[in-house]
């Protein structure tokens, strides 16, 4: 689900990057970089964008020594802001583009969600079609009515399970989703071509 949440965190920047200018722009740039590198958190999901900068507190004046033993002044500012987020949850209905087809399932990408796995066991009435290498058609899943799930096809699916993976130092955290087409006649391929990045 999509949300707009208020968040607070400390943003650290090197004093030499200020060059006598207002700290607001460097702080905002650093905050954006941190969110891009972190990508997602367990509580709120994927960070989609900062919608408002609420406040920037006073510098906490931390000093550290760098590797060359020259003292580098690190300024740390408490920042409050609102952020648009996307948290996938069991039962959500999403749509995304098929990126890879294997004999036992397909990987779907939906906006920032790169790893939605749709198992053949969760595709009622579909069967795997392995095309010979000499043919132009790629491997895909197909029903008796000839509807296909193949690379590039946009698929509507329901979230069956969600797993959050937090990486060391919170760099490029990610969500992994199990998808299903069971339980609703509207689930399945909705077009043969579509946006690689559905509107978020």
Swiss-Prot record:
InterPro entries in UniProt: NA-bd_OB-fold, RNA_pol_Rpb7-like_N_sf, Rpb7-like, S1_domain
Source species, domain of life: Eukaryota
Lineage of producing organism: Eukaryota, Viridiplantae, Streptophyta, Embryophyta, Tracheophyta
KW Transcription (keyword) present: yes
Keywords: DNA-directed RNA polymerase, Nucleus, Transcription
SS bond partners: none
Protein name, entry field: DNA-directed RNA polymerase subunit 7-like protein
Family, per entry: Belongs to the eukaryotic RPB7/RPC8 RNA polymerase subunit family.
GO biological process: DNA-templated transcription initiation
MF terms in GO: nucleic acid binding
PANTHER family in the cross-refs: DNA-DIRECTED RNA POLYMERASE II, III, DNA-DIRECTED RNA POLYMERASE SUBUNIT 7-LIKE PROTEIN
CC per GO annotation: DNA-directed RNA polymerase complex; nucleus
Localization: Nucleus
